[in-house]
C-alpha cells in the first residue's frame, strides 16, 4: 500500500472528475478520526523555507509497506513537516491511478469490518499492492491503519487527487507508450513497480532558481487548480522519519529511517532495507557551498548508515542492510548533483537537465513522462514569461509546450540545451543475474558504469570522483561458495517482458563468454554487517578537513577540485589505473577492478567499472586507507603518527599477520598465564602468490582475536597484449578478502613493499574488563590499541576524547605522543637485548671468573657494597662488590639469597642477572645507563630542573613496575625494599626492579616472621612493619608501589617536610598519607588509595593492579586531560631524562640510607 502525505482538498476542482473518487471521499468523511502517534506543528499554509543553513527537503513521503521484506509492519509514524511538491503530485498521482481500478474492485468485495490485527502476509507482487493516502488535518497525520478496510477507504479517497491535471497542455509531450487508462501520461509509475522492473530515472534538478521562498499570493490563486500546492514549503527544520514495528518476531523491534539534509537538490532516496519505501522531496532552490548529508537507517541495533565526506564537497551515503535484506542503497553526489543507486533496481538511468531559464519563477512544475522502459523524466523546463497565468499553468503538474519531454524506448531524454549527458548505470549480466529476490546475488548491488561523463556549458569536464561506500553482504552460511561471472563488454538490454520473466525464475549460473573475468569468493558471517555499520560520527567542517576523514575515506583520488593536502602521500597508497589523458576513477571502500584500455579517450568513450562479484567478497573492510598506509613503506606520511583515534574510527581495523611462526607464538602467548609482555612483529607484504585464512583466537581473550589473513584475488585484463597485476594484502577482522587490482596496459610491474609493525600482546588471563587486554597502557598509536577494535560485537566505548578534540592537541599532547612512540621503540630494542642476553647465559654457568671482567669506573658506594661499571665478554655490565660486615656466615647467606632471587627473576622488568663471583663476592648484572628513578626525579646532586612525566608515561612506568612485582610474587619472592632508589632505568627509559639484598622467599603459609633490622626505607615503609606486628605478607610491596607511583606522578619525595622516622611513625599511627594532586585521573587516584590502605588485607593484589592500570590507559588513549596538568607539565621539560653524571648510573643501587 502506498502512503503519501498529500492531503486531498475537498471542493477542489481537481478532485471532482470521477464519481468513484467522489464516493471514496464521501466514505472517507464518514470514517471516525483516528488518533495519531505524532503531532506535527507545522503551519502548512504560510510556512516558508527560510533557513539558509539547514533545509530539510523531504517534501513528500511515499512508502510501500507491502513490498517490504519485513512482514507484519502495522504502524507508520511520521515526524517532521510536509512540503508541497509538484513533482510529488505526479508521483503520488501515478501511484493512485496505477491501482485505482483494482482497489475499488477489492473494496466492493471486502466486508465492512476487518480484524484489528492482520497476520503477516507473504511478499506480494506489485500488481496486488494497494495505494492509500495519508490523512492530514490541521498539520496532523493519522497513521494507525488498524484494518485493511480503513486503509482502502483512505486510499480511494485520494485517488483522483490530480486526475484533472493530466488533461491539459500535453499535446507536445511525446510518449511512445500510453498504457494507463486514467490519463497517466504524465505520471511516474508507482513505487511498487520499481522493485520489480528495470527503471530509468531521469531526474532534472532545478538548480537555477535563486530563491527558496515562494509567493504565497500566487499559491493562493492556484489553490483551486493544484490542491497539492497548499503546503508550499515549511521552515520547520525537523527531519522526517518512518518507523514501523516488526510483528514477525517474538519481540517487537522499532525501526526508524531518518533523513537529515541541508542540500538543495536532493530529490529522492530509495532505501533497499525497506525495499520500495521512498522519501521524495522537492528542490527548494537553495544552494549550499558545502553540502553535508547524514542518512541513517537502523533496522537492527548494529545497523546504521555510512557517510563519506571529501574535501572537495563530494560525499556518499550508504544505508547498511540488515539480515533480512540483501544489500544497501547508495547515494552519490558530485558538484552539488546527486545520483541515486538503488540495489533493488538493476538498471537506473539518471539524467540531470538544468533547463529552467526563469530564475524568478515561484515554483516550477516537474513534467513527467512514462514510456515502455518505465523512464521517469522530471524536467524543469520553463521558458515562459513571469506573468501569473503562466505561474498557474506551471503549478498544474502538466507538460509545458516546450517539446522537451520526449521519451522513447531507447531511454533518450532530448532537451533543448542538453546541458548534462546521461550517467547510465547498466547491468551487463541481467540475463543471468536479474533476480531481485536473490539475496546471494551481489550483482544486484554493484552496477557497471558506462559513460560517466559530466559536460556542463561545453567545457566537458569529467566527473573526477565516484564514491560508493561498502554495502553489507547478505546473511548466508559461511560454508557457501558463490561463483559469479561478469562481462566487461556491454550487452543489449532485455525487453520489459523478458526482464519480468527473469525476475520470476530462480538464479542460475551462466557460462562466461571469452572476454570475462571470473572471481570465486567465500561468504562470511553476519558480523561483517556490523563492521560496516560503524558511524563516522562528526559532520563538522573539522571532520571534513581532518586527517581522520582523509585516510578513513581513502582519498587517494586524483581530482582537479580536490585540495587534499595529503594527496601526494596517497598516490602510492591506493592502486588505480591511470593512462595518458585519462582521469583516475577510484572507490573508497569497495574493491574495484579498474581497467583502462589504451584506446580510451576523454569525452564520451566508455569507461568500464567492473565491480567484483560475490556475496560477501571484498566488501567488508571500511578502512582501506589504513590498509594502504600500512602496506606501503615508501609513503612519506604515516597514518599512525600524531593522531588520535577512538573506537568509532577503527571499528573494523586490525593488523594482518603473515608469518606462520609469529602466529604460533601469539597463540601460545595468549594461552599462557604468566604476567610478561610479548612483543609481536608483523610484516605485511603486498604481493603474495596464494591465499589462505589463518585465524588465531583464544576463548578467554575476546578482544585479542588476531586474524592472519593473506587473501589475494588476481585479476588480469588483456589489452594491447600487456597484462599487469598488482595485488594488495588485506587488513581485516575476519576472513573477508579485500583486494585492489590495478591493470595498467602500458607497463608490467609487481609491487612488493613491507612495513614492520611492533605491538604488545598481553597474556594475562585475569583481566577485569574485556577491553583491558592490551598491555601497552599509554600508547594510542601502536597496533596494540588498534587490536582492541577487532571484534565487531564490541559494546563499550572508551572514555577518551572525541575526534574533534583529539585533532586539536596542545604541545603537551604531541610531546606525550612522541614519548609513547619512543617508548614503543625502546620496548622493541629492550626485548631484543633481553633475548640476546638470555641466549648467551642459557648455556653457561652463572659462576664468572673475576679475570674475565673489565672494571672501568666506580659509579657508587654504600655501607654494604660498591658498584662498578665494566664489561664482560662484550656485554656492558654493572659489578656489585659486597663488603663483608659482621658475621661471615650471615654475609654468605645474604649473598647466596640475593643471587638465587636474581636467577629466579627472569623478567624484562627485572634487572638481568648475568653471573656471580665468590672470591671476591661480586654480583654481575646488566648495566642500566639511565640510573635510578630517584636521581632522575629529584636530582639531589644536580642543579638541572626535575623531570615531570606526562600522564601516559606515568601509566606506562607504573604498569612496568607492577608487572615486575607481579612476576616476583608469582615465584613467591617479596622484595621488601621497593623504593625509587631501587627502580632503575636503561638508556631508553624502561623501568626495571633491582637490589634483592633484602628480598625474601615467602613461606607456604603466606606470611613471614618479622626480623630485626630496618626493612625498607622509612619514607616508603609500610605501617605493619613500623608497628612490628610480628607477621607480614607480600602486601608490603603493594604499599611501597603506591608511594613510588605517587612519586612519579608528582615528582616529589614522599613526606619531604618530615624526617624519615617521623614520617613512618605518622603513617603507622596517625594514618598519614601523601596528598594526591587534582590533575590525577580519578580511577588512578582510587587505585592509589586502595594500595596504601592500613590493613594489608584491604590492599589489592598485583593481578588486579595490572589490569586496572590497563583499563585506565584504555579509557585515556592520550592521557588524562586537565588544565592543572597542563600547567604542571611544562612543554619545554624533557619527558625522558638520564642522569647527567654517568658516575651515578648503576644497575645495582646503593644500600638505602636514611634521608
UniProtKB/Swiss-Prot annotation:
- Gene3D superfamilies to which the protein is assigned, alphabetical: Phosphorylase Kinase, domain 1, Transferase(Phosphotransferase) domain 1
Gene Ontology molecular function, alphabetical:
ATP binding; non-membrane spanning protein tyrosine kinase activity; protein kinase activity; protein tyrosine kinase activity; STAT family protein binding
Q: Which InterPro entries does the record associate with it?
A: Kinase-like_dom_sf, Prot_kinase_dom, Protein_kinase_ATP_BS, Ser-Thr/Tyr_kinase_cat_dom, Ser/Thr_Kinases-Pseudokinases, Tyr_kinase_AS
Write down the Pfam families for this protein, in alphabetical order. Answer: PK_Tyr_Ser-Thr
Q: Which GO terms describe its biological process?
A: cell surface receptor signaling pathway via STAT; hyperosmotic response; positive regulation of gene expression; positive regulation of protein import into nucleus; positive regulation of receptor signaling pathway via STAT; response to differentiation-inducing factor 1; signal transduction; sorocarp development
* Domain Protein kinase, residue spans: 853-1126
Enzyme class, first EC level, given as a word: transferase
State the GO CC annotations.
cytoplasm; cytosol
Q: Which SUPFAM superfamilies match?
A: Protein kinase-like (PK-like)
* Disordered: region residues: 1-54, 77-253, 352-423, 453-529, 571-599, 710-753, 1134-1155
Any idea of its EC number?
2.7.10.2
Positions of ATP binding: 859-867, 880
Q: What keywords tag this UniProt record?
A: ATP-binding, Kinase, Lipoprotein, Myristate, Nucleotide-binding, Transferase, Tyrosine-protein kinase
N-myristoyl glycine lipid modification positions: 2
Write out the biased-composition intervals (Polar residues): 243-253, 453-465
Which named protein is this?
Answer: Dual specificity protein kinase splB
Q: Which organism is it from?
A: Dictyostelium discoideum (Social amoeba)
Taxonomic classification? Eukaryota, Amoebozoa, Evosea, Eumycetozoa, Dictyostelia
